[in-house]
Amino acid sequence: MFLNKENISKLIISNKFVKAKELEYAFYTMLKQFDNIIHSKKIRVYKDNGVRDDLSLQLNKTSFLNVEDLHKFLSKEFKATDYCVAISEIEKYSHKISDFFISNIIHEWSKNLGEQLLGFELYSFLGKYKITPFGIHDDKEHTILVHLGPNPMYLYCWESEFYESIAGKESTVLGNFNTDISKPGVSPHKVEPGDFIFIPKGMYHAIERSEFSITLGAIPIPLTARKFSERFIQAKLSEIITNSYNFFNYKPVDQIKSEILNITHIIEDGLKNIDFENEITNEYFRLKSNGFLVNRCLVNQSVLDEIKISDYKNIQLKKELAYLLVFINGIELKIRHSNSIEELFNYLNSNKTITKDIMIKILCKEMSLEAAEKVFTLIKSYT
């Protein structure tokens, strides 16, 4: 396996690692659920030289049979020849893609590095643009990419110390396809369809797509991150239920950190340290990027006002003293028990779908309308 303790700190490109056509087929199969992906708010669109503009995305029923169809469709929808589309949480839409990463990467990662992983967060970038709208940047976690093609892309990478000595620690300005990459001079790596790329955390990088192409990505989630996420979500959901606490405002990250650190009845005092504050910061920006940013797509509101779980999944419930443990989509929530909370999850298990109106009606048996609406918003962001 190409990942081991000796080379974990280095950029790795393994040529022709995978048969890209097989994953490309899985990707197009996933895109048959394009409407569902849009409704889930797990899609971001960048055009007009890299500015985010989800208003461009319309809900047209379309079958994507090949690359040309998809590129033609998106160019027409966005009214732009250069654009970037980012899709998050692909593991919810394609079992084949998810199984590929589990079989080929997760087990090998744990075996070679001795690091237990909860799993991977899967995503995709596709489009045609000069430099990625995120500019030259470093990531908080290791990044794994599999390039599907059909055309090559170009990857620019800088060791952190070298880049920061030239440009400082700040990433380049976001929302711009024209990031100047000439100052920290480096030759691009040509990445062909089927190539596997490993970018260690902290390594600055940028991607160029002069021709249309699709890339799948995975962010490893260490088991420790799972424990942090559980506490984070438990605290927020419990606060919403008991105090009508509203997390879904655009608040400065320092204010969010301060508020979370004050929730001592859920999060242990021992976690109040620099590492924990860094984790809060990372989680905040992850949520802001992929979860709670308002998606401005013009969609049917009735479709947004419902929660769905896959037909083959069940929400597991377990009572523990005054709490209800809820295992949903890989996240364990510890919620203060109430009959209405238990009723709504049992309803969702039976019907696989619950509308906002039905859920509010159930929750309002024991809480205010304001609190019930916030519970709906939070639970929906994790389904």
Give each language-model segment a name.
Residues 3, 21, 28-193, 208-247:
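Active-site region of the double-stranded beta-helix
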Residues 196-197, 201-206:
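Histidine-centered metal-chelating micro-motifs
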Residues 24, 28-31, 268, 360:
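Residue-level detector of alpha-helical secondary structure
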Residues 3-5, 175, 180-190, 206-383:
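Fe(II)/2-oxoglutarate
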Residues 17-19:
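Conserved DEDDh/DEDDy metal-dependent 3′-5′ exonuclease domain
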